[in-house]
Amino acid sequence: MNPTHSQQPHLTIIGAGLAGCEAAWQAAALGVQVTLHEMKPTSFSPAHQSADLAELVCSNSLRGAGMNNAVGCLKEELRRCATLFMQAADATAVPAGGALAVDRDAFSRYITEHIEQHPLITLQRNEQCSVPPEGTVIIASGPLTSDALAPHLAQLTGSRHLYFYDAIAPIIEADSIDFSIAWKASRYGRGGDDYINCPMSRDEYMTFVEALKTADKVAGKDFEKVIHFEGCMPIEEMARRGDMTLAFGPMKPVGLPDPRTGKDPFAVVQLRQDNLHATLFNMVGFQTKLTYPEQRRIFRTIPGLQDARFARLGSMHRNTFINAPRCLDQHLRLTSDPRMFFAGQITGVEGYVESAACGFLAGLFAAGQLTDHAVPLPPATTGLGALLGHLSHSSPDDFQPMNVNYGLFPPLEGRKRKRSERRLAMAERALRDLEPWRQRVLSHIPDLKPFPAEDSDDV
């Protein structure tokens, strides 16, 4: 796929987030000229702050790094396929126990610089308010698709957009944390002292939960229907589900004994390193849509955070996605108009890694169509194939966003295995089955050594 410059096919991509950037990178690597449209800095969504591409607006964690977690398997697949996403993640990683977390600013800057420097990618910083009437297009406008573009996408897909809120967790300056109360440790001592832990007694916890239940929230727009995705549930919504929901969820204390007592507290608030210099820590699982004054008031009641300085307070934003099983084919093409591809969270995948994976595939599929080189589907036994299976084979009547998980993978044949053994066997099968597909589709990428299977400790 190396046509001369005058013969080079052209691809338009709308949206330069994780999916759009990865799609552009892959298509350009296969000799396609790409025009990548990004509305920042001309226009910002309610959740974005940086002019850089591929901005991480929720957590800075890319989740579990080991093979015992399906997202760890998917990351290794993307690593073996030489994705820009994994190059950036590995280059900007920060300590996070058994998870892979990144310095969010360095990560976005890495991707931005590589996109800007690629000779076949033209970055145009303007808001696309409609879809080009001609040519091959990838829509990767993300969960925060602009109000101007959304009606055009609704018309294209012939379906209503569904809205729910992804809530963003606060970030705290490390030197404002009281370490006479808080301490550093990872759960069960795995992965080093990568988390800061703030303990709560039963009375402190119950008071905290009650405060969350009665706190003022930011009101959503009248036309937005609130459908919360379980993986990014606001902490105040979890508190309303039951007094002990948080204690068995993001505030679970098991494996985190307080060094002052030697015993597990009743509940624990964990903070995870957010930048390379370890000056910023985000509150794990504390996505929220509380008003800013309420966040300061309530979160400063947490022992160890009484003097906390917030580098960023939590916020909420809309998530827009299409009914992929009804609208798209297996190659992420719009069934009613095969020149149109969709990629990223707007398709109904959920999470940073999944969005990048979807962009990776869309870029390959679009480039293949443009150059008359059909790109085969990845094996269903891989994380990549499992994601495509979710988008194409789920029931269209109750389709919802989904993180990658081993439940999406085909079951193993043969004898029954324990859960941990079964997951590792699925990962080994995925990486084994990926290789012939990778060699066929990405022949310019050299063979890589096997990746060791490890357990994950993603909190």
UniProtKB/Swiss-Prot annotation:
Transmembrane regions: none
Record flagged with keyword Transferase: yes
Stated family: Belongs to the MnmG family. TrmFO subfamily.
Tree of life domain: Bacteria
Keywords attached to this entry: Cytoplasm, FAD, Flavoprotein, Methyltransferase, NAD, NADP, Transferase, tRNA processing
Cited Pfam families: GIDA
Gene3D superfamilies listed in its UniProt record: FAD/NAD(P)-binding domain
Residue sites binding FAD per the record: G15, A16, G17, L18, A19, G20
Name recorded for this polypeptide: Methylenetetrahydrofolate--tRNA-(uracil-5-)-methyltransferase TrmFO
GO biological process: tRNA methylation; tRNA wobble uridine modification
Enzyme Commission number: 2.1.1.74
This protein's encoding gene: trmFO
One GO CC term, this protein: cytosol
Cofactor names: FAD
Subcellular compartments: Cytoplasm
HAMAP family: TrmFO
rRNA processing as UniProt keyword: no
Highest classification ranks of the organism: Bacteria, Pseudomonadati, Thermodesulfobacteriota, Desulfuromonadia, Desulfuromonadales
Catalysed reactions, as listed in the record: uridine(54) in tRNA + (6R)-5,10-methylene-5,6,7,8-tetrahydrofolate + NADH + H(+) = 5-methyluridine(54) in tRNA + (6S)-5,6,7,8-tetrahydrofolate + NAD(+); uridine(54) in tRNA + (6R)-5,10-methylene-5,6,7,8-tetrahydrofolate + NADPH + H(+) = 5-methyluridine(54) in tRNA + (6S)-5,6,7,8-tetrahydrofolate + NADP(+)
Main location: cytoplasm
Protein purpose: Catalyzes the folate-dependent formation of 5-methyl-uridine at position 54 (M-5-U54) in all tRNAs.
InterPro entries associated with the record: FAD/NAD-bd_sf, MnmG-rel, MnmG_N, TrmFO
GO molecular function, one term: tRNA (uracil(54)-C5)-methyltransferase activity, 5,10-methylenetetrahydrofolate-dependent
